[in-house]
Amino acid sequence: MVGLKPSEVPPTTAVKFLGAGTAACFADLLTFPLDTAKVRLQIQGENQATQAARRIQYRGVLGTILTMVRTEGPRSPYNGLVAGLQRQMSFASIRIGLYDSVKQFYTPKGSDHSSITTRILAGCTTGAMAVSCAQPTDVVKVRFQASIHLGAGSNRKYSGTMDAYRTIAREEGVRGLWKGTLPNITRNAIVNCAEMVTYDIIKEKLLDYHLLTDNFPCHLISAFGAGFCATVVASPVDVVKTRYMNSPPGQYCSPLDCMLKMVTQEGPTAFYKGFTPSFLRLGTWNVVMFVTYEQLKRALMKVQMLRESPF
């Protein structure tokens, strides 16, 4: 590594793992209200809402956030943030941080180029691994985001994040913390493939054709394209996942039952409820995360090189 710039030194797996989790947490801090708005729009129309909650109608991303602030207070768009950050540190670290390592594992020996099939396999693998580890944090995050508290006198089911884990495990069993794992694995396999493979390919082509250098504009364009593709392919699964994870025991027999009830009761357009906030969320999140991730990798490699330098 002597004589090389930090940007020229291949980052280690540990650097990618730490950088991905940190960058994802930073992206979540900036975009969490958009995610909460998406969840509220996705569950709107369900029959489980209280009478007071049914009177609230959410219209659009900004309208949803403003309605939440007006009826529930300024902190409401950040309900579930702690669980969200816990999720990203375990979830993004695996699905993004380990993507290159798994891609290299699937690449045939002697080949210096990864095929699209190899990249898709890597995306599916790290996405499934991440869900297996982070599912309880996702369940708690969605429960907080979906809960409506109209004033100081309203009942709060959970007093805090740790209480939510305990309450769900006590009332629904440990399996309650893993509710919706199958649709979530499906969703994140799709999202991870769309995000990572699209980002990988766009960035590779921009560099191969010398359209851009490996810097901010290249990362920005690649991340935006990744966010758009991920939203288009993942929205239907995302809506089913949100509805199923937020549902009380007995409302849906399975994710498939949830999907069928959505079609019969609300029509096929229900699968794209919250599409705009989903795109704003994923698009913005991808831009912030990937740009931060690329810079963090370089910064961490620079620190590592300084520590290893004899002078």
Curated annotation (Swiss-Prot):
Database matches in SUPFAM superfamilies: Mitochondrial carrier
Side Mitochondrial matrix, residues: 33-76, 137-182, 237-270
Region (Purine nucleotide binding): 278-300
Membrane topology: Multi-pass membrane protein
CC terms in the record's Gene Ontology section: mitochondrial inner membrane
Keyword Transport: yes
PROSITE patterns from the UniProt entry: SOLCAR
Solcar repeats: 11-105, 114-205, 214-299
Pfam families in the record: Mito_carr
Functional description taken from the UniProt entry: Putative transmembrane transporter that plays a role in mitochondrial metabolism via an as yet unclear mechanism. Originally, this mitochondrial protein was thought to act as a proton transmembrane transporter from the mitochondrial intermembrane space into the matrix, causing proton leaks through the inner mitochondrial membrane, thereby uncoupling mitochondrial membrane potential generation from ATP synthesis.
Sequence similarity: Belongs to the mitochondrial carrier (TC 2.A.29) family.
Annotated PANTHER family: MITOCHONDRIAL DICARBOXYLATE CARRIER-RELATED (PTHR45618)
Name of the protein this chain belongs to: Putative mitochondrial transporter UCP3
Protein source organism: Canis lupus familiaris (Dog)
